[in-house]
């Protein structure tokens, strides 16, 4: 062992340099957030939990065109259309999304001609059972009613890119 190596090991230079490096980072502001209590802002293009929207008069937007069902690569959407109404329009009788299969690609949202199906701002929807991840029309409409303000704002902010 050389004299230089012996001096370095006796004086603990590596230990001291590592200690000062640690102290330098110890007093800097932390780059992480305290997650459950603080949340980062999400992008207007964020794709979270699905929702069905309504028109301002309360009528559901979905016209049962089944484009979202056709374009879904995971085949997670099931739609049954009701009979035509007197005014010639159709509405859905059944609108189910299997969130276990869903890959959150956003193709259903892009395919919808009336902005009925959207992916909302919620990303915290963990459940205890798989059955809770099978969303029916009532659950999707409730999600849409709950987040209508946030969804409308996100669509407005994203309008130049559509």
UniProtKB/Swiss-Prot annotation:
Protein localization: Cell inner membrane
Protein name: NADH-quinone oxidoreductase subunit I
Species per Swiss-Prot/TrEMBL record: Nitrobacter winogradskyi (strain ATCC 25391 / DSM 10237 / CIP 104748 / NCIMB 11846 / Nb-255)
Annotated Gene Ontology cellular component terms: plasma membrane
Catalytic function, reaction form: a quinone + NADH + 5 H(+)(in) = a quinol + NAD(+) + 4 H(+)(out)
Molecular function terms from GO: 4 iron, 4 sulfur cluster binding; iron ion binding; NADH:ubiquinone reductase (non-electrogenic) activity; quinone binding
Entry cofactors: [4Fe-4S] cluster
Superkingdom of this protein's organism: Bacteria
Residues binding [4Fe-4S] cluster 2: 72, 102, 105, 108
Subunit structure: NDH-1 is composed of 14 different subunits. Subunits NuoA, H, J, K, L, M, N constitute the membrane sector of the complex.
Primary gene name: nuoI
PROSITE patterns per the UniProt record, alphabetical: 4FE4S_FER_1, 4FE4S_FER_2
A GO BP annotation: aerobic respiration
The protein's role, per its UniProt record: NDH-1 shuttles electrons from NADH, via FMN and iron-sulfur (Fe-S) centers, to quinones in the respiratory chain. The immediate electron acceptor for the enzyme in this species is believed to be ubiquinone. Couples the redox reaction to proton translocation (for every two electrons transferred, four hydrogen ions are translocated across the cytoplasmic membrane), and thus conserves the redox energy in a proton gradient.
Topology relative to the membrane: Peripheral membrane protein
NCBIfam families listed in its UniProt record: NuoI (TIGR01971), PRK05888.1-4 (NF004538), PRK05888.1-5 (NF004539)
UniProt lineage: Bacteria, Pseudomonadati, Pseudomonadota, Alphaproteobacteria, Hyphomicrobiales
């Amino acid at each position: 062992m050389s004299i230089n190596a012996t001096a370095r090991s006796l004086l603990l230079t590596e230990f001291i340099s590592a200690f000062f490096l640690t102290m330098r980072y110890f007093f800097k502001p932390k780059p992480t957030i305290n997650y459950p209590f603080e949340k980062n802002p999400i992008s207007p293009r964020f794709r979270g939990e699905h929702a069905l929207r309504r028109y301002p008069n309360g009528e559901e937007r979905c016209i049962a065109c089944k484009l979202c069902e056709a374009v879904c690569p995971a085949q997670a959407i099931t739609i049954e259309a009701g009979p035509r109404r007197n005014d010639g329009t159709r509405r859905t009788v059944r609108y189910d999304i299997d969130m276990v299969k869903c890959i959150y690609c956003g193709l259903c949202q892009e395919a919808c001609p009336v902005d009925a199906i959207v992916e909302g701002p919620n990303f915290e929807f963990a459940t205890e059972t798989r059955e809770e991840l099978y969303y029916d029309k009532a659950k999707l409409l409730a999600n849409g009613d709950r987040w209508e303000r946030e969804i409308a704002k996100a669509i407005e902010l994203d309008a130049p890119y559509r």
